[in-house]
């Protein structure tokens, strides 16, 4: 597992950055909807 991570150090950060951005947006959206539901209830 550690070898795999050190094998593609150039492709890891790019994918991680994109995934992080998408995940962050999705997380914010889900959290917002959850909070809205709680507040509306």
Curated annotation (Swiss-Prot):
Query: In what way does this protein cross or attach to the membrane?
Result: Single-pass membrane protein
Q: List the gene name.
A: psbL
TM spans (from-to):
20-40
The record's subcellular locations are: Cellular thylakoid membrane
Superkingdom field: Bacteria
UniProt entry keywords in alphabetical sequence: Membrane, Photosynthesis, Photosystem II, Reaction center, Thylakoid, Transmembrane, Transmembrane helix
Q: What function is annotated for this protein?
A: One of the components of the core complex of photosystem II (PSII). PSII is a light-driven water:plastoquinone oxidoreductase that uses light energy to abstract electrons from H(2)O, generating O(2) and a proton gradient subsequently used for ATP formation. It consists of a core antenna complex that captures photons, and an electron transfer chain that converts photonic excitation into a charge separation. This subunit is found at the monomer-monomer interface and is required for correct PSII assembly and/or dimerization.
Q: Which Pfam families match?
A: PsbL
Q: Which GO terms describe its cellular component?
A: photosystem II reaction center; plasma membrane-derived thylakoid membrane
Q: Which family does it belong to?
A: Belongs to the PsbL family.
Q: How does it assemble?
A: PSII is composed of 1 copy each of membrane proteins PsbA, PsbB, PsbC, PsbD, PsbE, PsbF, PsbH, PsbI, PsbJ, PsbK, PsbL, PsbM, PsbT, PsbX, PsbY, PsbZ, Psb30/Ycf12, peripheral proteins PsbO, CyanoQ (PsbQ), PsbU, PsbV and a large number of cofactors. It forms dimeric complexes.
Q: Write the protein's name.
A: Photosystem II reaction center protein L
Give the NCBIfam families listed for this entry: PRK00753.1
* Database matches in InterPro entries: PSII_PsbL (IPR003372), PSII_PsbL_sf (IPR037266)
Tell me which species this is from. Answer: Trichodesmium erythraeum (strain IMS101)
Major localisation? membrane
A single GO BP term for this record reads: photosynthesis
